[in-house]
Amino acid sequence: HFICQAQGETFMDTRVIYTQLLSSIQFPPFLAMEYIATQPVVESPEQAAYDAVHTCPDIARVRPGETVALTAGSREVYDIVGILRGVIRAVREQGGVPFIVPAMGSHGGATAEGQVRVLEHFGITEEALGVEIRSSMGTVLVGHTQDGYPVHLDRIANAADHIIPIGRVKPHTDFRGPV
């Protein structure tokens, strides 16, 4: 009785399989719940990003013609293209020359080209944003932690006059230990 036929095709009846597999398992009682987020809804992430940069006192440090590296990572961010557009608009209004640098460690096969492909997966392209994507796996040593560990920065971002980090902040899935 595992095999069924419909419209001339034979297939496994998954209901019977699940019933047999799960019949000896006792599940705890479940309660239907609904979670309602109390945080305000951002109607336009693009406008919110523009407003945040446009009203930030530090944007005044950007002088006409200076380069501004905007980071874009491999962690999914809702409407990341809109957010980047808002930041790009604010930087351009200040006279800055924005560009995108991938910020994702070994994702994309740890190659500059692979990281550009990861950004493309999220809709982050030169065509969509009207700015260059400058990708490199090269880094420069910018200092050391208090414990003596070296701190590296993307060499292209380091060469920019300014850097605006944009991305999702979350601990690495393999990180263990106190922060």
Protein language model regions, located:
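Short glycine/serine/threonine-rich phosphate/pyrophosphate-binding segments
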Residues: V77-L84, G109, H172-F175
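Short connector loops at secondary-structure junctions
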Residues: V101-R117
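Short glycine-rich or small-residue beta-strand-to-loop segments that form or flank ligand, phosphate
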Residues: T67-V77, F99-S106
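An acidic, phosphate/nucleotide-engaging active-site surface
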Residues: G114-P178
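Histidine-anchored nucleotide/phosphate-binding helix
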Residues: Y78-V97
